[in-house]
Amino acid sequence: MKFIAVVAALTASLAMAAPTESSTDTTYIACPISLYGNAQCCATDILGLANLDCESPTDVPRDAGHFQRTCADVGKRARCCAIPVLGQALLCIQPAGAN
């Protein structure tokens, strides 16, 4: 009877000590879901209120640098916008981690 209790306790302690996920395995979210949740590549920024000639990035951003390079490849800047409509976007900010 004591043997079963010892085995059960040992098994439980091993299960609790096993790591679940790597903490370095994070996913980059350029524009967290909020008011500014739409990733856009825009050519002209007018005081952060309006952006002109905007389009969605051609690749899903892997990190801030990748997002900026993807937009720079088409001559635009990475932005997180609130309301993208017909190539224009209202209320835009820089993406997370961008310079």
From Swiss-Prot:
- The signal peptide, as residue positions, is 1-26
* Disulphide bridges: C31-C80, C41-C71, C42-C54, C81-C92
Q: How is it used?
A: HFB1 is partly responsible for the reported antifungal activity of S.alkalinus, and may serve as a potential source of lead compounds, meaning that it can be developed as an antifungal drug candidate.
Keyword terms of this UniProt record = Cell wall, Disulfide bond, Secreted, Signal
Compartments it resides in: Secreted, Cell wall; Secreted
Cellular component GO terms, alphabetical: extracellular region
The record's subunit annotation is: Homotetramer. Further self-assembles to form highly ordered films at water-air interfaces through intermolecular interactions.
Recorded family membership: Belongs to the cerato-ulmin hydrophobin family.
> What is the documented function of this protein?
Aerial growth, conidiation, and dispersal of filamentous fungi in the environment rely upon a capability of their secreting small amphipathic proteins called hydrophobins (HPBs) with low sequence identity. Class I can self-assemble into an outermost layer of rodlet bundles on aerial cell surfaces, conferring cellular hydrophobicity that supports fungal growth, development and dispersal; whereas Class II form highly ordered films at water-air interfaces through intermolecular interactions but contribute nothing to the rodlet structure.
- Name of this protein: Class II hydrophobin 1
Organism per entry:
Sodiomyces alkalinus (strain CBS 110278 / VKM F-3762 / F11)
